[in-house]
Curated annotation (Swiss-Prot):
E3 ubiquitin-protein ligase which accepts ubiquitin from an E2 ubiquitin-conjugating enzyme in the form of a thioester and then directly transfers the ubiquitin to targeted substrates. Residues 1-117 form the C2 domain. The keyword Membrane applies. GO terms for cellular component: cytoplasm; membrane raft; nucleus; plasma membrane. This is E3 ubiquitin-protein ligase SMURF2. Keywords: Cell membrane, Cytoplasm, Membrane, Nucleus, Repeat, Transferase, Ubl conjugation pathway. Pathway: Protein modification; protein ubiquitination.
């Protein structure tokens, strides 16, 4: 009896099989790693290593080890590059997975599981990517040999149409059917539309251990239950109604035609028999191109009307990110356009016959070969669909991540009282490549650890200091709008060029590390930062009166009206200074023939008036961190969003992307919190957001893209068990606010306001 007790409570024998890994990170430019896996039982010291597989990012080992696992033991499986492990301690690390005791029990006897590789610790700067496939078997389930497993099937992401792979909170993979709105554990093999009965309704939050309906009906509610049959019929009717396609679906293309899309998102139609292609939809007769659009009703959801540079109308499909000349309402409602009344049948037949493939000769005048569709807007081609800013930003982040060193940190320690000068001294003594390292900021005298929140607050406070017009580096562009521009009289500070260099570096660091500057410049400033020329239109947002005056000069005959020369004046600290727009411009009059040159030179001078050296210093600092060529895909408005984020706070977006911890939407704390937020003005909402996240700015994608210590992390309201005399606490690295269970709305409002306005500093719990 005693022996059996020892066996029951002592170490358990498990067989761990390390099958393969996939998509490992490539850290060398010219060669691939030699991966091997190392298995360590934390607690007992058992250690095993697999064979080394040469020159691959997708190694296959298929080796097993018998382990004795205690009640509190954990298993660490790490992947290493054999080529580098001898260089120094920790070299060659490619990722690891740590299985705690609860994870071991959950994964045991569940077959092969794909696990994401992670870093050794949260502060580790090594880049990690990929997955490893392992299985755990109990001793009584271990056979003489394991089944042959096709590793490629474990990583096959080509799911049938209508399916999506997701993970539960515990990490188990489930498959979502978008047609039947259901989920299942088994990997699907047929398109979603062929599944008539759902695995699990999406509206139900079913625990992953709850029995579900299997093909043979062995688990769950019996298949012949009349309630199930009734629900199934009703659900099928609902699906048929929701998936109906005959009302507003375009008719099939004529025989021999295919619809294709260029790499730029331009839709065209190819006639496979003749090899010619056209922008025009062959389903729509050409004589219907001038039909009254009001008769067709509104555009389908996600569509937009735009004009080319030559004024031709085209249509943008934001759902599929494509563009086309054909009105989508024409092809979708063709039967209504061609048959407006019973008497219109003959006209319909004639119109349809004119668009048949037999009349290709007539259409050939506007077609080109498939591989040579013209791209010049003057050729009336459909404009390219510009990828949305989020996608372009994602590409920029990927480019920047490749430049980040694998080791080391950019450490900055400053005091809150001297944040500007101390940051200036530390940042300016670093090399540009040091600024690419993982940013670690510490406020002197505070214990907070920087997992992103401290750096965000540092940039927030530093922005307010370095962009403050009080220091003379910048000035407001207009009295009524608080956008900034470079102060042409900044030379009163003899070190001003070095400070502009510093400002450029800080802006670059914010973009590189995924943070934001709390301030805004004029749009022409961002245009200059991109290296694009300034035009008269850029003047309108900066100086509307001057813009109107220059437009009047261009639009009217100034002969005998204006007595201007190519020389302008401006006031510098009470002194009138003259500036010649061209050599000897003081003696050159502005005439009807030279007014365009005068306006062009005036605009360039207005934006670069006395700031050429300052701007070049700032641009140099910015491009030291963010190379100029990486920004070619962006325009000035997009660059403004990248540098400054979204200043406008959308409360509805905030609410819908907030996580609740130890509370529900119906909890008083949650209701009172949002009531307080709605009562705040924009400035106070920004202060609240800065208090909780470290930044008053919202990411481009909205609140769903708030960043935490290790990737996106939603804004979180956490009701804690604490004295109601305490103030709310914020965890900026996790975007979480801890709120005690206050007795009333007024008390929550006062405590929250006090925390926002009267507190500062970081500590460690």
């Amino acid at each position: 009896m005693s022996n059996q007790g020892v066996r029951r409570n002592g170490p358990v024998k498990l067989r761990l099989t390390v099958l393969c890994a996939k998509n490992l990170v490539k850290k060398d430019f010219f060669r691939l790693p030699d991966p091997f896996a190392k298995v360590v039982v934390d607690g007992s010291g058992q250690c095993h290593s697999t064979d080394t597989v040469r020159n691959t990012l997708d190694p296959k080992w298929n080796q097993h080890y018998d382990l004795y696992i205690g009640k509190s033991d954990s298993i660490t499986i790490s992947v290493w590059n054999h080529k580098k492990i001898h260089k120094k301690q920790g070299a060659g690390f490619l990722g690891c997975v740590r299985l705690l005791s609860n994870s071991i029990n959950r994964l045991k006897d569940t077959g092969y599981q794909r696990l994401d590789l992670n870093k050794l610790g949260p502060n580790d700067s090594d880049t990690v990517r990929g997955q490893i496939v392992v299985s755990l078997q109990s001793r009584d389930r271990i056979g003489s040999g394991g089944p042959v497993v096709d590793c490629s099937r474990l990583f096959d992401n080509d799911l049938p149409d209508g399916w999506e792979e997701r993970r539960t909170a515990s990490g188990r993979i489930q498959y979502l059917n978008h047609i039947t709105r259901s989920t299942q554990w088994e990997r699907p093999t047929r398109p979603a539309s062929e599944y008539s009965s759902p695995g699990r309704p999406l509206s139900c939050l079913v625990d992953e251990n709850t029995p579900i309906m299997t093909p043979n009906g062995a688990a769950g509610v019996p298949a012949d239950d009349p309630r199930v049959q009734e629900r199934r019929v009703r659900s099928q009717r609902h699906r048929n109604y929701m998936s109906r396609t005959h009302l507003h679906t375009p008719p099939d293309l004529p025989e021999g035609y295919e619809q294709r899309t260029t790499q730029q998102g331009q839709v065209y139609f190819l006639h496979t028999q003749t090899g010619v292609s056209t922008w025009h939809d062959p389903r729509v007769p050409r004589d219907l191109s001038n039909v009254n659009c009001e008769e067709l009703g509104p555009l389908p959801p996600g569509w937009e009307i735009r004009n080319t540079a030559t004024g031709r109308v085209y249509f943008v499909d934001h759902n599929n990110r494509t563009t086309q000349f054909t009105d989508p309402r024409l092809s979708a409602n063709l039967h209504l356009v061609l048959n407006p009344s019973p008497n219109g049948s003959r006209a319909a037949v004639e119109a349809q016959s004119s668009s048949r493939p037999g009349q290709l000769k007539e259409q050939a005048q506007s077609v080109v070969s498939p591989g040579n569709l013209p791209e010049d807007p003057e050729c009336l081609t459909v404009p390219k669909y510009k990828r949305d800013l989020v996608q372009k930003l994602k590409i920029l982040r990927q480019e920047l991540s490749q430049q980040q060193p694998q080791a080391g940190h950019c450490r900055i320690e400053v005091s809150r009282e001297e944040i500007f000068e101390e940051s200036y001294r530390q940042v300016m003594k670093m090399r540009p490549k040091d600024l690419w390292k993982r940013l670690m900021v510490k406020f002197r005298g505070e214990e907070g650890l920087d997992y992103g929140g401290v750096a965000r607050e540092w940039l927030y406070l530093l922005s307010h200091e370095m962009l403050n017009p009080y220091y003379g580096l910048f000035q407001y562009s207009r009295d009524d709008i608080y956008t900034l521009q470079i102060n042409p009289d900044s030379a009163v500070n003899p070190e001003h060029l070095s400070y502009f260099h510093f400002v450029g570096r800080i802006m670059g660091m914010a973009v590189f590390h995924g943070h934001y500057i709390d301030g805004g410049f004029t749009l022409p400033f961002y245009k200059q930062l991109l290296g694009k020329p300034i035009t008269l239109d850029d003047m309108e947002s900066v100086d509307p009166d001057l813009h109107n005056s220059l437009v009047w000069i261009l639009d009217n005959d100034i002969t005998g009206v204006l007595d201007h020369t190519f020389c302008v004046e401006h006031n510098a600290y009470g002194e009138i200074i003259q500036h010649e727009l061209k050599p000897n411009g003081k003696s050159i009059p502005v005439t009807q023939d030279t007014k365009k040159e005068y306006v062009r030179l005036y605009v360039n001078w207005r934006f670069l008036r006395g700031i050429e050296a300052q701007f070049l210093a700032l641009q140099k600092g910015f491009n030291e961190v963010i190379p100029q060529h990486l920004l070619k895909a962006f325009d000035e408005k997009e660059l403004e969003l990248i540098v400054c984020g979204l200043g406008k706070i959308d409360i509805n977006d905030w609410k819908s992307n907030t996580r609740l911890k130890h509370c529900t939407p119906d909890s008083n704390i949650v209701k009172w919190f949002w009531r307080a937020v709605e009562s705040y003005d924009e400035e106070r909402r920004a202060r609240l957001l800065q208090f909780v996240t470290g930044s008053s700015r919202v990411p481009l994608q909205g609140f769903k893209a708030l960043q935490g210590a290790a990737g996106p992390r939603l804004f979180t309201i956490h009701q804690i068990d604490a004295s109601t005399n305490n103030l709310p606490k914020a965890h900026t690295c996790f975007n979480r606010i801890d709120i005690p269970p206050y007795e009333s709305y007024d008390k929550l409002y006062d405590k929250l306001l006090t925390a926002i306005e009267e507190t500062c500093g970081f500590a460690v719990e």
